[in-house]
Amino acid sequence: RYTRAVPAVAYDLMELSEKPLTLVLDEGMMVASAVLGPESTIAIRVTQDPICRELVRRLRKPLVSTSANLAGGPSPTCFADITDSLKSGVDYILPLRQAEKKPPVASTVIRLKADGQIRILRK
């Protein structure tokens, strides 16, 4: 729906991945141009988080997010590390897991090209 074609290997990766996974696919579409990467690529995060999955299911739309820091600023590893100025600049913060101190696992990022090329961008 948000890319012209999903390579068959993407489904295998989604099923077999044991950690968060982001797939960078060709020909992103039906999203704001600011969401697209170079050459109109689209990065789709496959999440197992039950809250995110339920939000997407109920909204019937993808969620768009960014890092919890300003460009060039330090990357927070837990909610307490997010600056107050950033928190006050958003519309809503889910009242969940704010006391957690364990850093989340970064996603594996894999570039899947329509011609079959596969490139691991981040393990």
Task: Set out the residue ranges of the language-model regions.
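Active-site-adjacent structural elements in enzyme catalytic cores
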Residues: R1-K123
